[in-house]
Amino acid sequence: MGESMNSCLEEINGCLDSITSLYFKPPGIFHNAMIRISKDGKETHTLNDKIKNLIKGCDPKEETTLFQLDPVTKSLRRKDGRQALFDYLDKRDLNMKRNRRLGHKDEKPVIHVPNEFYIREHDEELLRDSQRTKRFKAAGHGNDIDSNNTNNTTTALITELFNDDVGLMATMRKKFKENDEIKNLLMALQKGSVILDEKEGISTNNRRRTLFVEDFSTESILKLLDAVLEMFPTEEYKKAAEQYHDVFQELNEESEKLLAEIQLQKDEIEGRLKIESSKDSTTGVQKLIEKERQKIAELESQLRISN
């Protein structure tokens, strides 16, 4: 394999994290098994191409020598005459179309599912939607929702996530119960905005202030993101979070450099202003002394004339 034991263990741990989160990156587990993501975020194809070819089949050029076009059905057939499930389904579809044109009855399905099963599944789904809607109303959100409306499944699922008693929001509130800023951020994420009073030390003009998600600090948002990733450790989201952290670190370092340069320029300007002000004050005193000397000289000349 040409890989060290540590890299193999890291890959296994990543697969385990993906399985425990019940999420498989599109297009699914086959893609995860075949495509290996390196640490720098690039896809690597080492042994995976060979495995894919082995599972998928032979080379496309070789496939043309194994199949031929049926002149009657205009579909591909194996040259050796062997048939599989696809051939059976294709033939069954043609027979059903022909029988319908002739007015014959359709063939019975291979597996027959009783109608009672579908009715029971439908009733259970309605019951689940009703229970979710009741919990949604009990939480004080959306009292005008019709409990008989079956189109509220998406709303109910979102409610489960943002429920005050259970769900991700409740877990995050318990985790950051000592952090007021993140608690306000969670409220803004849940309701779109949060209103803060001057009691919380936010406003200085004795007025309320409305904060949106973008008004919170980047450090708090990234801290909350890391906490969510601990609950849902998917490789794709981890990679995106690492990129956000890297970009934030770069921007933060650049801003610190710019602030240091600005402070240095301010200090230089203040120093120059002090020097210029001291020069101006010195020249002003000298001018006053010169005027006084001129007055004294004039008085002396007048005294001489009078004498």
Curated annotation (Swiss-Prot):
It is found in: Nucleus; Cytoplasm, Cytoskeleton, Spindle; Chromosome, Centromere, Kinetochore. One of its GO terms (biological process) is protein transport along microtubule to mitotic spindle pole body. GO terms for cellular component: cytoplasm; DASH complex; spindle microtubule. Residues 234-307 form a coiled coil. One of its GO terms (molecular function) is microtubule plus-end binding. It holds the Pfam family DASH_Spc34. Its main location: nucleus. Keywords: Cell cycle, Cell division, Centromere, Chromosome, Chromosome partition, Coiled coil, Cytoplasm, Cytoskeleton, Kinetochore, Microtubule, Mitosis, Nucleus. The keyword Nucleus applies. InterPro entries: Spc34 (IPR013966). It comes from the Eukaryota. Belongs to the DASH complex SPC34 family. Component of the DASH complex consisting of ASK1, DAD1, DAD2, DAD3, DAD4, DAM1, DUO1, HSK3, SPC19 and SPC34, with a stoichiometry of one copy of each subunit per complex. Multiple DASH complexes oligomerize to form a ring that encircles spindle microtubules and organizes the rod-like NDC80 complexes of the outer kinetochore. DASH complex oligomerization strengthens microtubule attachments. On cytoplasmic microtubules, DASH complexes appear to form patches instead of rings. Component of the DASH complex that connects microtubules with kinetochores and couples microtubule depolymerisation to chromosome movement; it is involved in retrieving kinetochores to the spindle poles before their re-orientation on the spindle in early mitosis and allows microtubule depolymerization to pull chromosomes apart and resist detachment during anaphase. This is DASH complex subunit SPC34.
